[in-house]
């Protein structure tokens, strides 16, 4: 028998991970999972104070190096500066979790009907959800190529990037007290992320850089009981997901456990898309 440690394949000690959207609802769980697995973590978020606070907590809790960085992923100069700071403070980058996604401060505009959706709002969301993915992958990928040691890039999509939302479940549905839907810009941007992942997986394969998509299904987070009931009725496991349930797939994709996996979309949705 080989002396290979299968548990050891998931060990991220000695590696540095960059997580965009790192202080967000799912992002903070992703950062915690990477840190607990031994990685140094750069918590990158538009909300710099939240990123710094989480980085301090990760360092204390897991004994790893962690830094918080404020960054607008839709701004090329901000992304370039972010990568430079990570390399300066933490060294080589081994893992990128391209996770930032945009919603609008103007929820009326973000949740408007398709017929009334403004082009300005469409572009604003695309600037983060797709342009931001491109800019961060480009900058970190360039750094990984220069390092010459490969790497792993994971890009967050959504189950609505592989299937359309069931608009019927939004009847009488609310999120934190307001009526909700899933706008077309979200669906379109997340589908594009999956396409970008496949392209980069083949483009950087000869550099040893693996690129995969992580696709969560619906996560329980402040939706009203009616929405949760209707959503769960469409899921074989009969419930929405919990935030921590997405982390295992990330750790698999970030680690040597997935060393022969690239260009794939790992869907964690309770079986929703299996019907």
Which stretches of residues belong to each language-model region?
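Catalytic Tyr-X3-Lys loop
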Residues: 94, 115-135, 154, 186, ...
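Catalytic loop of short-chain dehydrogenase/reductase
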Residues: 106, 119, 145, 154-192, ...
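Active-site Tyr-X3-Lys motif and surrounding loop/helix of classical short-chain dehydrogenase/reductase
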Residues: 81-88, 107-127, 230
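Canonical Rossmann dinucleotide-binding motif of NAD(H)/NADP(H)-dependent dehydrogenases/reductases
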Residues: 9-42, 200
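Short, small/polar-rich loop/turn modules that mediate ligand/substrate recognition or access, typified
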Residues: 96, 205, 210, 261-263
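A conserved structural motif in NAD(P)-dependent oxidoreductases
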Residues: 235-246, 257
């Amino acid at each position: 028998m080989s002396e290979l440690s299968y548990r050891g394949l998931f060990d991220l000690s000695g590696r540095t991970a960059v997580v965009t959207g790192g202080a967000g609802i799912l992002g903070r769980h992703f950062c915690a999972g990477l840190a607990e697995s031994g990685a140094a973590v750069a918590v990158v978020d538009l909300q710099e104070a939240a990123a710094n606070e989480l980085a301090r907590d990760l360092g204390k809790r897991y004994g790893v190096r962690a830094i918080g960085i404020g960054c607008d992923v839709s701004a090329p100069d901000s992304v370039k500066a972010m990568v430079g700071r990570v390399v300066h403070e933490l060294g080589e980058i081994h893992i990128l979790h391209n996770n930032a996604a945009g919603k609008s401060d103007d929820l009326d505009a973000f949740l408007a009907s398709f017929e009334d959706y403004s082009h300005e709002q469409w572009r604003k969301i695309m600037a983060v959800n797709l342009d931001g993915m491109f800019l961060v992958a480009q900058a970190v990928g360039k750094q990984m190529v220069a390092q010459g040691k490969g790497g792993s890039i994971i890009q967050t999509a959504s189950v609505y990037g592989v299937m359309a939302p069931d608009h019927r479940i939004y009847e009488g549905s609310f999120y934190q007290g307001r009526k909700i839907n899933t706008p077309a810009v979200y669906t379109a941007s997340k589908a594009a992320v999956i396409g970008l992942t496949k392209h980069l997986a083949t483009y950087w394969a000869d550099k040893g850089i693996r690129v995969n998509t992580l696709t969560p299904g619906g996560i329980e987070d402040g939706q009203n009981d009616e929405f949760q009931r209707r959503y769960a009725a469409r899921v074989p496991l009969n419930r929405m997901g919990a935030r921590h349930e997405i982390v295992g797939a990330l750790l698999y994709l970030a680690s040597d456990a997935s060393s022969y996996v690239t260009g794939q979309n790992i869907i964690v949705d309770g079986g929703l898309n299996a019907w």
